[in-house]
Regions:
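Substrate-recognition "cap/lid" segment bordering the active-site pocket of phosphatases
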Residues: 114-168
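Short, structurally constrained coil/turn elements
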Residues: 32, 100-102, 133, 166
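A structure-centric signal for secondary-structure junctions around beta-strands
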Residues: 3-4, 103, 137, 167
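Short beta-strand/turn micro-motifs composed of small residues
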Residues: 110
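N-terminal helical cap/lid subdomain that shapes the substrate entry/recognition surface
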Residues: 2-95, 102, 113-119, 142
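Surface-exposed alpha-helical segments enriched in charged/polar residues
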Residues: 95-98, 161
Length: 168
């Protein structure tokens, strides 16, 4: 058996704390009391997948969200509630990442969207004083940029083929 050379990490829950309940609570406070029925993580809704794969723009997302929720909220209200789930980048995890980087080729692959991306990059900069979280990795892959998301095998094959990795 060969030793491990490459590691593909996720972002949410690994390096960035995620609190889904905060987004749910924020939308309920804005009047969307059936948030779970419409938008839960386990409810199949193409709106989120389309946003996470870059098929729709931020502005289109806001409009479709309003239509789906059947309530008028401003773009800023939606953005603020949508980003409420984004937590901190615990510094001890970033220190651990630096140690791992010394021994392995590390990559990031995250299902995300441009709204969250912009917000968590600001969080990272505020917490660390540095402006590019992506520098921790040989390459960072975000679903909205590659048009593919987890858990679909094609998303992993995309990275494996682009980086000439051997999955084991």
């Amino acid at each position: 058996m060969q030793s491990i050379k490459n590691i593909i990490f996720d972002l949410g829950g690994i390096f960035l704390d995620i609190h889904y309940q905060l987004t749910k609570d924020a939308f309920i406070n804005l009047g969307i009391e059936n948030f779970d029925e419409l938008f839960s993580q386990h409810h199949a809704n193409n709106l989120f997948e389309d946003l996470e794969t870059g098929k729709i723009s931020e502005q289109t997302f806001y409009q479709l969200f309003r239509n789906e929720a059947n309530v008028y909220l401003s773009d800023e209200q939606i953005k603020t509630a949508w980003n409420a789930l984004l937590g901190r980048f615990p510094l001890e995890r970033l220190d651990w990442l630096k140690q791992i980087k010394e021994k392995y080729n590390i990559y990031l692959f995250s299902n995300t969207n441009q709204i969250h991306y912009d917000a968590f990059m600001k969080i990272y900069e505020t917490e660390t004083g540095k402006n590019d979280f992506n520098n921790h990795f040989l390459k960072a892959y975000y679903s909205q940029n590659i048009g593919l998301r987890k858990p679909y095998p094609a998303s992993f094959l995309y990275i494996i083929n682009e980086q000439n990795l051997v999955p084991e």
